[in-house]
Amino acid sequence: MFRGINAITIDTKGRLAIPTRYRSALGAEDKIPLVVTIDTEETCLLLYTAAQWQIIEDNLQKLPSFNAAARRIQRLLIGHATDVEVDANGRVLLPTVLRNYAKLEKDVVMIGQGNKFEVWNKELWESKREQWLAEEASMTDGLPEEMKTFSL
């Protein structure tokens, strides 16, 4: 399980250094590829283990092919999905098209989300986080039904 926020610098070649504490869980020592794709809801990237991505891709493939919204999601997520390998120094090369989509330049954050990481432009992340905290503080609708029995 991946959790926590890690501030990272992308080098001039577009390589992202995976924090040491996650490398074995991601299969870096075994040269198992990771999969990176776009997030269709936010301006960030999603980084999965190959095994976790396969589950998601299988589910995406099961969506109805005559549904325009389903095809759009398939095109975006599967179409942008790229296998990336962890090099000997624990880095992955993020494709230019994906870095451009997420506005990743130098300072980024990796945010653990359980089964995946989100990779954000640091300034964009800080702005969104402040927005979400403000929205949470001013919520008048209350929690969604699914969360009313949830406890921390």
From Swiss-Prot:
PROSITE patterns: SPOVT_ABRB. One of its GO terms (cellular component) is cytoplasm. The keyword Cytoplasm applies. The keyword Oxidoreductase does not apply. PANTHER family: TRANSCRIPTIONAL REGULATOR MRAZ. GO terms for biological process: negative regulation of DNA-templated transcription initiation. It holds the Pfam family MraZ. It comes from Legionella pneumophila subsp. pneumophila (strain Philadelphia 1 / ATCC 33152 / DSM 7513). GO terms for molecular function: DNA-binding transcription factor activity; transcription cis-regulatory region binding. Its main location: cytoplasm. HAMAP family: MraZ. It is found in: Cytoplasm, Nucleoid. Residues 5-52, 81-124 form the SpoVT-AbrB domain. Belongs to the MraZ family. This is Transcriptional regulator MraZ. Keywords: Cytoplasm, DNA-binding, Repeat, Transcription, Transcription regulation. It comes from the Bacteria. InterPro entries: MraZ, MraZ_C, MraZ_dom, MraZ_N, MraZ_sf, SpoVT-AbrB_dom, SpoVT-AbrB_sf. Forms oligomers.
